[in-house]
């Protein structure tokens, strides 16, 4: 009879105890989760999956900031977006007359779908599957809106070709609220000048376009150019002599030529 403390007895007790614990785990597998087995099962899931997994890996630079790989262009889901630009009554007839010059830039350059809705008196824009520029719809809306404000088609097309052009609108009474009746008419006349010469002089000196629509003034051009033109128009509204304003414009024009 071997001693109770023999090594053979210890091996039998240990081997006899192992199946019991495994059986208990198998019976209670819905409640008990072994940490070691779960870690082993999760290893294949977290393993890198070739090149695709390397693209999504996050690396950390020397300063401790995360560095991600550049995103790749993927085929996104096509979604239709629409815009509706209302047309004022006094600009609907010019819109019909110039429609053959308005829709080609929108269709050929921006790849948009355009429709002139006569019933609702609006121009409807919609993206298509050929539209590649994300800002095409906004550019098309700005182009049509510029025409409805009174700008020529050739001037409005510049909004499609250049990205640094803006439109700024304000009313004469925003500058001087006390203008009424004949005083308001004289202020408008000072801005236009005789036969529109002063307005053209401001446009040529500042490289902008100005539209006088009753009591509203619309400016089209670059940011700094609009500020210079607006300052000249405000000076005329406040009563400055046209000669003084024109002299200041000549100085500003010479400075702008030296800058560019």
From Swiss-Prot:
The terms describing its cellular component in GO are: cytoplasm; nucleolus
Which Pfam family is one of this chain's hits? KH_PNO1_2nd
Q: Which UniProt keywords apply?
A: Cytoplasm, Nucleus, Ribosome biogenesis, RNA-binding
Stretches that traverse the bilayer: none
Q: Which domain of life is it from?
A: Eukaryota
Output the SUPFAM superfamilies linked to this UniProt entry: Eukaryotic type KH-domain (KH-domain type I)
Q: Which Gene3D superfamilies match?
A: K Homology domain, type 1
The GO molecular function terms of this record are: rRNA primary transcript binding; unfolded protein binding
The listed locations are: Cytoplasm; Nucleus, Nucleolus
* UniProt keyword annotation of Membrane present: no
- Start and end of every KH domain? 181-233
GO biological process annotation, one example:
endonucleolytic cleavage to generate mature 5'-end of SSU-rRNA from (SSU-rRNA, 5.8S rRNA, LSU-rRNA)
The family assignment reads: Belongs to the PNO1 family.
Q: What does this protein do?
A: Required for small ribosomal subunit (SSU) synthesis. Has a role in the processing of early nucleolar and late cytoplasmic pre-RNA species.
Per UniProt, subunit arrangement is: Component of the small ribosomal subunit, ribosomal RNA processing complex (SSU RRP complex).
Task: Give the protein's recorded name.
Answer: Pre-rRNA-processing protein pno1
Q: Gene encoding this polypeptide?
A: pno1
């Amino acid at each position: 009879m071997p001693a109770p403390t023999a090594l053979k007895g210890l091996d039998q007790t240990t081997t006899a105890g192992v199946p019991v614990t495994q059986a208990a785990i198998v019976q209670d597998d819905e409640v008990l989760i072994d940490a070691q087995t779960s870690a082993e099962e999760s290893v294949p899931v977290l393993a890198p999956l070739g090149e695709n997994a390397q693209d999504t890996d996050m690396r950390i630079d020397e300063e401790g900031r995360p560095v991600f790989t550049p995103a790749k262009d993927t085929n996104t889901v096509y979604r239709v977006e629409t815009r509706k630009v209302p047309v004022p009554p006094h600009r609907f007839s010019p819109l019909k007359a110039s429609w053959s010059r308005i829709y080609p830039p929108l269709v050929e350059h921006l790849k948009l779908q355009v429709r002139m809705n006569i019933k609702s008196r609006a121009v409807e824009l919609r993206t298509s599957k050929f539209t590649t520029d994300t800002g095409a719809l906004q550019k098309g809306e700005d182009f049509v809106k510029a025409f409805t404000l009174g700008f020529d088609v050739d001037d409005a097309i510049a909004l499609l070709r250049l990205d640094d052009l803006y439109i700024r609108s304000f009313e004469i009474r925003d500058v001087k609220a006390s203008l009424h009746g004949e005083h308001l008419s004289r202020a408008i006349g000072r801005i236009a000048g005789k036969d529109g010469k002063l307005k053209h002089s401001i446009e040529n000196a500042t490289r902008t376009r100005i539209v006088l629509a009753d009591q509203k003034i619309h400016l089209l051009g670059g940011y700094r150019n609009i500020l210079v033109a607006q300052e000249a128009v405000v000076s005329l509204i406040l009563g400055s002599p046209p000669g003084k304003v024109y002299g200041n414009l000549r100085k500003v024009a010479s400075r702008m030529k030296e800058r560019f």
